């Protein structure tokens, strides 16, 4: 549950940072506009990091190499996508399309493994890919 709690703090920070009334920065409260996609990206990144870490503890780590690599790539692009959406970047749609592509690859790889962490990651990647595709459309 610690992972979800950290997600809540990140989302609170995004909301606070984009809507603080006394901020001298340009007001770009894009968080509500992209809320479901940002949440999906952050949940996916969290699941990917957990999966990659757990895969390193598996007996046959060589068999998990592709999974670990895709988990790390997916987590990286998910964090980047969430950040760009929270900033209201004009590049957010393009990056979200790339994020969706990587999430689908990670979903496919993780689905091959029967471990709980891989199955959880596959589900999170599917949700994120679908949200990013909607956002990028």
Question: Where would I find each of the regions flagged by the language model?
Answer:
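N-terminal amphipathic/basic-hydrophobic helices that include classical n-h-c signal peptides
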Residues: 1-24
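Amphipathic alpha-helical hairpins
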Residues: 16-137
């Amino acid at each position: 549950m610690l992972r979800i709690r950290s997600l809540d703090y990140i989302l609170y920070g995004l909301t606070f940072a984009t809507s603080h009334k006394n901020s001298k920065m340009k007001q770009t409260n894009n968080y509500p506009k992209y809320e479901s996609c940002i949440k999906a990206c952050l949940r996916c990144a969290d699941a990917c990091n957990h999966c990659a870490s757990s895969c390193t503890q598996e007996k046959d780590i060589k068999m998990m190499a592709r999974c670990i690599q895709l988990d790390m790539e997916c987590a990286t692009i998910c964090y980047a996508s969430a950040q760009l959406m929270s900033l209201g970047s004009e590049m957010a749609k393009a990056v979200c399309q790339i994020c969706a592509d990587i999430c689908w690859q990670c979903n496919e790889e993780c689905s091959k493994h029967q471990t709980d962490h891989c199955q959880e990651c596959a589900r999170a990647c599917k949700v994120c890919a679908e949200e990013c595709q909607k956002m990028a459309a």
